[in-house]
Regions:
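Solvent-exposed, flexible loop/coil residues
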Residues: 8, 12, 40-41
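C-terminal extensions
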Residues: 1, 17, 128-132
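Bacterial peptidoglycan biogenesis and beta-lactam-recognition machinery
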Residues: 2-5, 24
């Protein structure tokens, strides 16, 4: 009856599903006594971990924009994300000479958000995981 939106890839899919269920006045049950500890990439080698980190940064901002666009419209989503887009762009340019790690993080955030704004599908981000 309720399915995940396959346009989401990696982030916001459960938030979207809950919002859609709530919009039709159905119930959502929360078990707040359950705790899960996740170490996030601790079991992979450094190169794979870097690709995974790039992938996460790209997908988080892609999904964040898409979620807001889907539920509140393109203009609203653009309005709330425009300052981030500008900040990520300036940061990734400025940090190139000072911090390669922060440069890389902001570059993937910028391109994930920009890709969502111009309508590129989130599935292209899988290529980030396979790069050398």
């Amino acid at each position: 009856k309720y399915i995940f939106d396959e346009n989401f890839f990696f982030f916001f899919e459960e938030i979207d599903l809950c919002k859609r269920i709530k919009n039709i006045n159905e119930n959502i049950f929360v078990f707040n006594k359950i705790k899960i500890f996740h170490e996030g990439g601790k079991g992979v080698d450094t190169k794979i971990a870097q690709n995974y980190s790039d992938f996460r940064h790209w997908n988080y901002y892609w999904s964040r924009f898409y979620y807001h666009k889907k539920h509140y419209g393109f203009i609203y989503s653009l309005f709330i994300h425009l300052s981030k887009l500008i900040r990520f762009f300036i940061s990734f340019l400025a940090l190139y000479f000072f911090s390669k790690e922060k440069f890389r993080k902001n570059k993937f955030r910028f391109f994930g958000l920009f890709s969502s704004i111009i309508g590129i599908k989130s599935s292209v981000s899988k290529d980030i995981l396979n790069k050398n």
